[in-house]
Amino acid sequence: MKITVLGCGALGQLWLTALCKQGHEVQGWLRVPQPYCSVNLVETDGSIFNESLTANDPDFLATSDLLLVTLKAWQVSDAVKSLASTLPVTTPILLIHNGMGTIEELQNIQQPLLMGTTTHAACRDGNVIIHVANGITHIGPARQQDGDYSYLADILQTVLPDVAWHNNIRAELWRKLAVNCVINPLTAIWNCPNGELRHHPQEIMQICEEVAAVIEREGHHTSAEDLRDYVMQVIDATAENISSMLQDIRTLRHTEIDYINGFLLRRARAHGIAVPENTRLFEMVKRKESEYERIGTGLPRPW
């Protein structure tokens, strides 16, 4: 397949590496246009992939079979809209990012839209991307009109396993959102690795109760206890990890809070549900952000 990967950060480089190794024709797409992108990745087994790949070639984009978007949630909408007119109208766009809310911003996109969520973990260490842990990627249609692209899951399964297709991806996205609503803001506020959160079961339960109430009103059956058990499982499995939000805070970057707890707040408001704990966490992270964005270092640029 011919694939353009939009966003060449940790997750983007992970996919570029895996696609390249499987013989797919790939290019990166960067915010600052340049003819190549450097991919420098250390795999979970210690092997190294270090290549310069094509980037920002509009002819390549115009003949791509898939646009894989691995940007931060707040960058997605503007970036995808800027490329949509060059991309064939039949080429699916697969979004893989933390949080929810980008689909609502892309309702008028003509191309088929797919949403994904992944438990693969990768982080930056200087100029190198470390593939910290293998995981599973869930993908499915973002809107009712987006149809069956399960063949893509089969192809991507051979690239970076595991990949699972869901006709109803929304339920999976909400489960991941519950995890993100707990782990991301708490680690960002307390400046700690994920594993430290084990010591705060009451706080975690409080957040899960609020998230479960919203999920139920969204039409997906769950319980606060189920969400809590799942969150604790993820905390244990990723105990050593530094969450993406804490990485953003430490490097004075704009976080994805608007698409995590912020998205939950918007849906809660729509259903008339009070979510005081999530509101408090949202405001605390926004306050941290504003401390450095006020002096201009972490201002959200266009993607």
From Swiss-Prot:
Top EC category: oxidoreductase
Give its localization: Cytoplasm
Q: Per its record, how is this protein called by name?
A: 2-dehydropantoate 2-reductase
What's one GO-annotated cellular component?
A: cytoplasm
GO molecular function terms attached to this record: 2-dehydropantoate 2-reductase activity; NADP binding
One record GO biological process: pantothenate biosynthetic process
Q: Where, in this chain's numbering, is substrate bound?
A: N98, N180, N184, N194, S244
Q: Where does NADP(+) bind?
A: G7, C8, G9, A10, L11, G12, N98, A122, E256
User: Which family is it part of?
Assistant: Belongs to the ketopantoate reductase family.
List the keywords (alphabetical): Cytoplasm, NADP, Oxidoreductase, Pantothenate biosynthesis
Q: Whom does it interact with, and what assembly results?
A: Monomer.
Q: What is its EC number?
A: 1.1.1.169
Which pathway does the database say it acts in? Cofactor biosynthesis; (R)-pantothenate biosynthesis; (R)-pantoate from 3-methyl-2-oxobutanoate: step 2/2
Instruction: Please indicate if the UniProt record lists Oxidoreductase as a keyword.
Output: yes
Annotated signal peptide: none
Q: What is its main location?
A: cytoplasm
Active site per the UniProt annotation:
K176 (proton donor)
